[in-house]
Amino acid sequence: MKAVIVFCLMALSIVDAAWKPLPENLKEDLIVYQVYPRSFKDSNGDGIGDIEGIKEKLDHFLEMGVDMFWLSPIYPSPMVDFGYDISNYTDVHPIFGTISDLDNLVSAAHEKGLKIILDFVPNHTSDQHEWFQLSLKNIEPYNNYYIWHPGKIVNGKRVPPTNWVGVFGGSAWSWREERQAYYLHQFAPEQPDLNYYNPVVLDDMQNVLRFWLRRGFDGFRVDALPYICEDMRFLDEPLSGETNDPNKTEYTLKIYTHDIPETYNVVRKFRDVLDEFPQPKHMLIEAYTNLSMTMKYYDYGADFPFNFAFIKNVSRDSNSSDFKKLVDNWMTYMPPSGIPNWVPGNHDQLRLVSRFGEEKARMITTMSLLLPGVAVNYYGDEIGMSDTYISWEDTQDPQGCGAGKENYQTMSRDPARTPFQWDDSVSAGFSSSSNTWLRVNENYKTVNLAAEKKDKNSFFNMFKKFASLKKSPYFKEANLNTRMLNDNVFAFSRETEDNGSLYAILNFSNEEQIVDLKAFNNVPKKLNMFYNNFNSDIKSISNNEQVKVSALGFFILISQDAKFGNF
């Protein structure tokens, strides 16, 4: 049976595939933008981005066609993990502003027709949160808000109850003298895991959602959900065989600490809160897990779980069939009512351009915008920002710091979190201060929004062009078909019965290719050139059987009867 499954999955990468007619849910052609507040715009000159800075730049979202943006954590926090260690879920960290500033941002966004959602971090709190401090003292009802265990005695010595290893490495258990017990933390020791088997914890976290929804927020991006429940039998996890170092996260197979079935019931309870409100509220799920476990989130109330295939399944060395498989797998295994989505990057990864190079990064951006469903953009990727070198001395990310001077560059996420490059002025227009929390990329003189607005071939103007096309009601009706035109060229079409068709041709190889577009059914002989990454002077093609595609080249063709696209 395994062999059959593997064969079927492999076959998806080479056969023609089509999805038609396109269900209503696939017409949710939205663009979602991730704001990393520390690095977006500094309004007060302290070198750290803030809420007022985001408000100042809302028109940027409008210009690039964004429908909804989400804020990475802005809550009070000791900043051990840059806001993902929350000490108060219902307030704002002073470095970002005040809760009044946040209310004003919500109002300003809504006035411009933008939706705004918050990062919600339900798996753990900060160890400085009042709940944990009371739990340390064994005060009811907080004594059972976290997962405590007395450990076990081995050779006369007390040791952690299991061999579980945290995401950042080291034991997932830490001892506290106050409780004479170990507490669980799947991330940093300063991030104790909440106990969702305690219904009072779930009630309190549901109330956090209500607090922000009542203030006008349109929903949440929910962080790290696969870790939210554990197997309470506290069994040792089997060893992976990948390493002999018990302090490395890959030392064990996470069968008791990840993807526990009860997780999905918690998600449903979160959705129940969102459904209490008359206006539609959104829930976007972060879950790094396998495809089948990811797809289950659709059935438990998620608008969609993030599709991390561009992050997990392909690299700079991937070939065209890998990209076809990526698309086909998601579209095939997504439930009929699901909304597809495409996530090229986020704050935990190297930047898109640094992972793939500029031309392949442009191709991936093109795919994210022109495939059906939701395109998710990480701040700065719309202008092709790349990773910034950060020295060991200037490293801020705890994941990098914990790796030590010799290994920090392989672990630190700082290079992808540097200030947005607005223009070529001081600190790239991010701040009036030359001393920013992370250094600005030295390429900001040429890679910046102001410069790219003036260059018709820039990354930003490409993004705008495709975003505008995505918004066309006729384009939203278009069915999806995927093809391999040869071993090196992946193509997909968006076809309608009466309103025209689009053909995206992408050569991921380093050699020029000649392809026959008649691999698509009823493709017109003559097609207009909507976009060409290497030759913007070509306006059309008149022979669809012998089409040249430059090395690392791609172009978008539109039928002459199309009611979308501007010519």
Swiss-Prot record:
Give EC number(s), comma-separated. 3.2.1.20
Cite the position(s) of the site with description Transition state stabilizer: D348
Record's keyword terms, sorted: Glycoprotein, Glycosidase, Hydrolase, Signal
Q: Which Gene3D superfamilies match?
A: Glycosidases (3.20.20.80), Oligo-1,6-glucosidase, Domain 2 (3.90.400.10)
What glycosylation sites does the entry record?
Answer: N88, N123, N247, N290, N313, N319, N499, N507
Q: Where is the active site?
A: D223, E286
The organism's lineage is: Eukaryota, Metazoa, Ecdysozoa, Arthropoda, Hexapoda
Naturally occurring in which organism (per UniProt)? Apis mellifera
Q: In which tissues is it expressed?
A: Expressed specifically in the hypopharyngeal glands of worker bees. Also found in the brain of worker bees (at protein level).
What is annotated about its quaternary structure and interactions?
Monomer.
Q: Which residues form the signal peptide?
A: 1-17
One MF term in the entry's GO annotations: alpha-1,4-glucosidase activity
Keyword presence, Hydrolase: yes
Q: Which SUPFAM superfamilies match?
A: (Trans)glycosidases, Glycosyl hydrolase domain
Q: What does this protein do?
A: Converts sucrose in nectar to glucose and fructose.
The record, for Pfam families, names: Alpha-amylase (PF00128)
Q: What is this protein called?
A: Alpha-glucosidase
Keyword Hydrolase annotated: yes
UniProt record, GO biological process: carbohydrate metabolic process
Which InterPro entries does its entry note? Answer: Glyco_hydro_13_cat_dom, Glycoside_hydrolase_SF, O16G_dom_2
